Amino acid sequence: MSKQDSLWFKSLRWLQRKLVHTVVVPHDPFDDLNLDPSKPLVYVMKTESVSDIAALSEMTEKLGLPSPYEELEVNGIRAPRVVCLEGSKPLFGQREGGEQYIDYFKRLLSVHKQNLELDIQLVPVSLYWGRTPGKEDDTMRAAVLERQNPTWLRKCLMILFLGRHNFVQFSNAVSLRYMADEHGTDKRIAQKLARVARAHFERQRKVMTGPQLPKRQALFHALLKSDSITKAIKEEAASKKISESEARAKAMEYLDEVAADYSDSLVRIAERFLTWLWNKLYKGINIKGAEQVRQLHHDGHEIVYVPCHRSHMDYLLLSYILYYQGMVPPHIAAGINLNFWPAGPAFRRGGAFFIRRSFGGNKLYTAVFREYLDQLFTKGYSVEYFTEGGRSRTGRLLAPKTGMLAMTLNSVLRGVERPVTLVPVYLGYDHVMEVATYHKELSGKKKKKESVWQIFGAIRKLGNFGQGYVNFGEPITLHNFLNEQVPSWRDDIAKDPDQKPTWLTPVVNTLANQVMTNINDAAAVSSVTLTSMVLLASEQNALERSQLEKQLDLYLTLLKERPYTDYTSVPDGTGHDLVSQGLELKKLQIESDPLGDIISIDQSIAITMTYYRNNIIHLMVLPSLIAACLLRKENCGRNDVISIVNDFYPLLEAELFMGIEDPSQYANQILDILVAQGLVVECDHFEVVDSSINQLLLLSGTISETMQRYAILFNLLEVKPNMERSELEKDSHRLAQRLGALHGITAPEFYDKKLYATLSVKLKELGYLTDNQGCSDIKRIKERANLLLRSSVKQTIVDSVHAEHIA
């Protein structure tokens, strides 16, 4: 009988299963790590441990991986399935050396020399009993629970107290075939493998637990001694005519107001609560791109998460997902409005640090905040902040606030050694709890001050909220970004470290727009967002079920055959599946009659549903524009479509943070799909197939309100080419209100003054607001915008503009 089959071992494993709850990272090793089930596999672990192997065995059984107790048989050789770099640590004395494990690596490599077809996968596996990073100068607790090198007695205590927080992490496999072919099979290569594995396990531990936490008061005293805060204290004392000790006390107050007080114990408790909460709220959370972020952590990057801001739930969702993806929850920049009892202290111990809405010229506060942020980067803590500054009320991304990005870039300029990388994150929900409140605020109702009662009120309304979505976008490494934007930035800073570079503000603005674009590039399409888009484009927000399903199938085809980006996610299934999900979530209504089912949006929530449509409108706005061209322009050819797309794309790009590199190529690909789907026929020009007119009409409806805005702007500019930006914004907003009143436009963003401000800035950039140079372009684009509108809407715009500016 083998050792692991003995009654003693079976009893220990049974007891461990009762005490231990294990989380696997990543959740699907086959998919995320590209493991090949057809090839032999060997697990590599740092330390030999009965309990670790037992925990691994339980997970491999669930995942369909070979058991660590099952021997490897290749080429007539039998070998253990697990190789450990260190022997188990005895209660007294020294552990065994690693020579036998180097010999084992050598044996595995040698087998590849004998069999050229063989390719054994070496899979590193890390186990963590709890994820406490420890504190700087920690002594007593580290002695009791020495997690990295525990004896069997300490391991028993860890299982007893931390068994419910066990994580098993699989890493990318190393091909021994590749190692043997590229580097040989001798002992030197085996030793190199062992060294690389040790370094890997050490880096992996830092990713999972994070750096050690400083003592809060010790951190404050260290920060107060920094040059920048010392200088700010002296300036504060001189300007306010107070003593330096009083100014220092004020700086200490600011630090206490700002700084997080991260508690691993609270995070463990919060993890249990949040697991209950997500299971109560959502049927699942869909995650895309976590592996690339884990790799950035592993490669030593300082990670700054920059998510979009939909809901107060964002604070909890991203931290929860990162925790379960084997990464440390970040320190989150939270608005000072959330620092109310009891939520504020809880958020602070969960990693939140608080920031005022405005620094208001307070130089001491500014110096304190910047130095604290620098310290987070220097010590290696990941950070999270919302570049929009607040929650979007319309479902579209807001124009970015650049303050935190500027401070992050300044930290890089001041010499943060590790590469600092921004990770844009798209957060989406099938249901946003605050969405009804948002539309009340947009209608003029005053925003309520955050309080604990609001949280209790939200929790009381918990229900079936469908799915949540967390997509990680394309990372931006700031050193590389600076090299591209300002190749001489290092020399410029070295010449005068205290002088703000003239290029800094435009570079920060470019960075902010790139962040927002990368967030939108990672959008998640869902049943709610896509059905909202289709139904809101119909006349009465209602369609026959068969027609709705057919339209959804068309949109799914467009999104899958020509993906917006590699970071975008599109749901599996068919239009029928999406409609069923929408009905289940009670976002849609169904009425039946002898002719079939009718699916609609209740008029009372139609405005609310624009929020969900707006989450992904940028994904379908160009296909919608193309459909409008095909329907409304006579004898429309490819060149006509591409020319119209190129005219409007710069405005769409500015308004919707779009990142299509080649709009002409994209338009051609969409046209090819429409031809392949039988909606249009192409000869010298496009002919719309009669049976497909309704599908193209629905598709074109998505851009109708956007095109109305552009028609307002260009009709105004043609009548008065030299308009000032402020006048253009005011007049266009007034015309939008008139148009909405006459034609029943209810989408909140249609009346958003900030949106017209964004468009006016872009028009100025494009040269349409300077002298008469752009007059011919303005006339052409005005005619094209008018062409793509319904005749009644076009007439209202033309008449209103002439009545105001010509009469």
UniProtKB/Swiss-Prot annotation:
Catalyzed reactions: sn-glycerol 3-phosphate + an acyl-CoA = a 1-acyl-sn-glycero-3-phosphate + CoA
GO biological process: CDP-diacylglycerol biosynthetic process; fatty acid metabolic process
Enzyme superclass (EC): transferase
Motif, HXXXXD motif: chain positions: 308-313
Database matches in SUPFAM superfamilies: Glycerol-3-phosphate (1)-acyltransferase
Keyword Manganese: no
Alphabetical UniProt keywords: Acyltransferase, Cell inner membrane, Cell membrane, Lipid biosynthesis, Lipid metabolism, Membrane, Phospholipid biosynthesis, Phospholipid metabolism, Transferase
Cellular localisation: Cell inner membrane
InterPro entries: GPAT/DHAPAT (IPR022284), GPAT/DHAPAT_C (IPR045520), GPAT/DHAPAT_LPLAT (IPR041728), GPAT_PlsB (IPR028354), Plipid/glycerol_acylTrfase (IPR002123)
Classification via CDD domains: LPLAT_DHAPAT-like
EC number annotated for this UniProt entry: 2.3.1.15
Origin superkingdom: Bacteria
Membrane topology field: Peripheral membrane protein
GO cellular component, one term: plasma membrane
GO molecular function: glycerol-3-phosphate O-acyltransferase activity
Chief location category: membrane
One Pfam family this sequence matches: Acyltransferase
Family assignment from sequence similarity: Belongs to the GPAT/DAPAT family.
Name of the protein in its database record: Glycerol-3-phosphate acyltransferase
Native organism: Shewanella halifaxensis (strain HAW-EB4)
